[in-house]
Swiss-Prot record:
Gene name per UniProt: fzlC
Name of the protein in its database record: FtsZ-localized protein C
Keywords: Cell cycle, Cell division, Cell inner membrane, Cell membrane, Cytoplasm, Membrane
GO biological process: cell division
Organism of origin: Caulobacter vibrioides (strain NA1000 / CB15N)
Pfam families associated with the record: Hepar_II_III_C
């Protein structure tokens, strides 16, 4: 993107997506060579030296912990990512079949470790036994357990818990623990797959270096910071948004950077200026993405984050709320007026490795009315049990045409080699905004439906005086041809979808068109429209990776691609 876009208008140029097959072939070949090297004796020797001497820093991860969950693990019930194992007090989960792949990933990430050590000395002793169980089976390189999907978070958790564990460990157990941390931290910096997580791997390696006492920790810190600094400017945009365009990814990165900043301070190392700058920017963006119900907006593979977790991420920041109405680099606009708040996606999806969790949902929005989140998306995330179909256009509150989507994730060999990149998405998205005392206008236009010869324009007006939101969704032909309307008539069904939050309910009025929506506060809102047909259909909403039943309002019509069509609608408070 050339230059800094103005706050009142966002323009993202098209970017090419060619050569995906060749990229996949090269990535698969490189991955094979990498796996052979990682499993070799010379590599094992390389990451084993120099031998660590002990422990130094005790990094503090600001993420909230759940001692009650740790107590359940202590009693023999291991519950992770929607799966559960009954282990008994001394069972070994690493020698037992996991109930799902998601469970196995969380298990090997040591996602259970923070909650378990939060219980106290008994939890730390149980954690040491579990780590010993893991080491016995997976202590040497393994493509799954030592892969980027598991290793990064495991090193992070081990680094933060190491000194707490050491307090309950024998000398031999401490020696094993620091050796594990040194080998895995060094290995992190050699991984080239999953390049979208390079920054997070550098942070975890830096934490490991800070925790390792004496000279063995210093080279790891130096190497991690060398990898970290250029990645910070690439992954943290000028407005604080994450380069993946996921608000939740920004919050999780903020947690990681705060943890590293704390560890560097304990080690007596100054934090790089880029690290401090990234923390400030991420904090500002986090505040921008908080909606009126206190939760984070959910876009591009990020789930809704609750108030307690947000408060923990911002506890360091005493600057207070920023009055921002747009995130121009990230591609989002926020509209606030009366009791209605809207946040809209005004940018194209990320491309390449950054798009592995992106969604083909241009111009999607979320709407909060009187602090009730009424309109949202399915909230798919990589932790979700749902299929990648939830990344398509009809899984968000935007327009969908026929059975198509404004982009699609890779599948098959390409996805295996590269990851489930999003391809064929909107390449050009423009947004224009105008604010005055009467309200806010926002126009969004994108070419995500160019394969059907159409552009989608979403025009929104938030009337602060009438306390209502008016919208118009129109589909227009890409190339205007006066003679096209005289040709054969071809119609495509299209719909404007309003996905309801699971706590919201809707009913169609007697006129068959108007829809009454109520949230937890029981305040009613009318959605009036000029669609040909209106339906309330089933939907789903993901919360912590688990699907909850929800509904969606579907405004239906038809469009001739040579002519275009539109649906107008209005959201206004019900009387009484």
């Amino acid at each position: 993107m050339a230059g800094k876009p103005p706050v009142l208008g966002l323009a993202f140029p098209a970017r090419l997506r060619g050569g995906v097959l060749w990229k996949a072939i090269r990535a698969e070949a490189a991955g094979h060579v990498e796996r052979e090297w990682f499993g070799s004796g010379p590599h094992r020797l390389k990451i084993a030296l120099p031998r660590p001497e002990g422990l130094s820093a005790r990094p503090h991860d600001p993420r909230p912990v759940d001692p009650a969950h740790g107590q359940k693990i202590l009693s023999g019930a291991l519950t992770l990512d929607g799966g559960a194992l009954r282990l008994g007090v001394d069972g070994d989960p690493f020698d037992t079949a996991s109930p799902s792949r998601r469970f196995a990933v969380s298990l090997h990430r040591f996602d259970w470790l923070p909650d378990l050590v939060a219980v106290g000395p008994d939890g730390a002793r149980r954690a040491l036994r579990l780590i010993d169980d893991w080491r016995r089976v997976f202590g040497k390189w393994n493509a799954f357990s030592w892969g980027p999907e598991c290793l990064e978070r495991r090193v992070h958790h081990l680094a933060c818990a190491a000194k707490t564990l050491a307090a309950e460990a024998s000398d031999a157990e401490v020696a094993d623990l620091v050796f594990d941390l040194a080998r895995q931290g060094r290995h992190l910096l050699e991984i080239t797959r999953a390049p979208e997580r390079t920054l997070e791997r550098a942070v975890a390696a830096g934490l490991a270096g800070c925790v390792l006492a004496g000279k063995p920790g210093e080279p790891l810190i130096d190497a991690a910071l060398k990898a970290l600094v250029p990645q910070l400017d690439a992954m943290v945009l000028g407005d604080g948004g994450h380069a993946t365009r996921s608000p939740e990814a920004g919050v999780e990165l903020l947690f990681d950077l705060l943890t590293l900043d704390d560890a560097l301070g304990q080690r007596g190392r100054p934090s790089p200026e880029a690290l401090s700058r990234a923390i400030d920017r991420l904090s500002s963006a986090t505040r921008f993405f908080i909606l009126g119900d206190g939760h984070l907006a959910a876009f591009h593979g990020g789930e809704t984050v609750g108030p307690a977790r947000i408060a923990a991420a911002l506890a360091h920041d005493d600057a207070g709320p920023r009055s921002l109405n747009a995130a121009p680099h990230s591609g989002y606009h926020k509209m606030i007026g009366g009791s209605i708040e809207v946040i809209a996606d005004c940018g194209p999806p990320p491309v390449g490795p950054l798009s592995v969790n992106a969604c083909a949902q241009p111009a999607a929005f979320e709407i909060v009315c009187a602090k009730d989140r009424l309109i949202t998306s399915c909230g798919w995330s990589p932790e979700a049990a749902g299929a990648h179909a939830f990344r398509l256009s009809d899984a968000a509150s935007t327009v969908s045409v026929a059975d198509g989507s404004a982009g699609r994730p890779l599948s098959g060999f390409r996805a295996k080699a590269l990851g489930p990149w999003l391809v064929d998405g909107a390449a050009k998205v423009e947004a224009k905004r105008h604010d005055d005392v009467g309200g806010v206008w926002l126009d969004i236009v994108h070419d995500g439906w160019r394969h059907l010869g159409l552009t989608h324009a979403r025009r929104l007006f938030l009337d602060a005086v009438q306390d209502e939101l008016r919208g118009e969704d129109s589909l227009s032909p890409l190339a205007l041809d006066p003679k096209a309307a005289e040709g054969p008539r071809r119609y495509l069904p299209f719909a404007v979808r309003f996905h309801l939050h699971p706590d919201a309910r809707a009913s169609i009025a007697r006129d068959g068109k108007s829809v009454l929506i109520r949230g937890p506060s029981n305040i009613g809102w009318w959605l009036r429209n000029d669609a040909v047909d209106v339906e309330i259909a089933p939907s789903a909403h993901f919360d912590h990776g688990l699907a909850r039943k929800a509904g969606q309002i579907v405004l239906k019509s038809q469009v001739r691609p040579e002519v275009g069509a539109k649906i107008r609608w209005k959201l206004t408070k019900a009387e009484g």
